[in-house]
Amino acid sequence: MSDTAETQEAQTQEAQTPQLSMQRVFLKDISFESPRSPMIFQEEWKPEVGLELNTKSRQVGENVYEVVLEITVTVKNNGNTGYLVQVQQGGLFVISGLDDQQLHHALGAFCPATLFPYARENIDAVVVKGSFPAIMLAPINFDALYIESLQKQQAETTQ
């Protein structure tokens, strides 16, 4: 085999090899509200935590995707809002060599799971600065959420 043919074959194999790497992590937006401060600090603290998750993704360059994990945490105490935190944790990911289904899964589950620890850290930091105890969100199974979302979409399209 000639050197040119070997080089072309190596380049073809390299182009088909799946690549997924995080290029950058960034905090896109963060908001903290504590509407009942400072009176809430005089109450017995029995928090009820509500959590909302959402993800967005878009292609921003050749094989480069922006993924944004949006988390809203609402903590109530005795039925009243103690605080509300909203975070948009972003990341740039280089992804190539995946078919459409694999790419959709990577953008909908793998990338958000990679961003979650950064978002959780930012949420804890702002909550503590608001003079509340750290919330330490439990790990989230983004693969299960992704599968659930797909099943829900399929059920809606069959109706």
Curated annotation (Swiss-Prot):
GO terms for molecular function: unfolded protein binding. It is found in: Cytoplasm. Keywords: Chaperone, Cytoplasm, Protein transport, Translocation, Transport. GO terms for biological process: protein folding; protein tetramerization; protein transport. GO terms for cellular component: cytoplasm. InterPro entries: SecB (IPR003708), SecB-like_sf (IPR035958). Pfam families: SecB. HAMAP family: SecB. Belongs to the SecB family. Homotetramer, a dimer of dimers. One homotetramer interacts with 1 SecA dimer. PANTHER family: PROTEIN-EXPORT PROTEIN SECB (PTHR36918:SF1), PTHR36918. One of the proteins required for the normal export of preproteins out of the cell cytoplasm. It is a molecular chaperone that binds to a subset of precursor proteins, maintaining them in a translocation-competent state. It also specifically binds to its receptor SecA. This is Protein-export protein SecB. It comes from Marinomonas sp. (strain MWYL1).
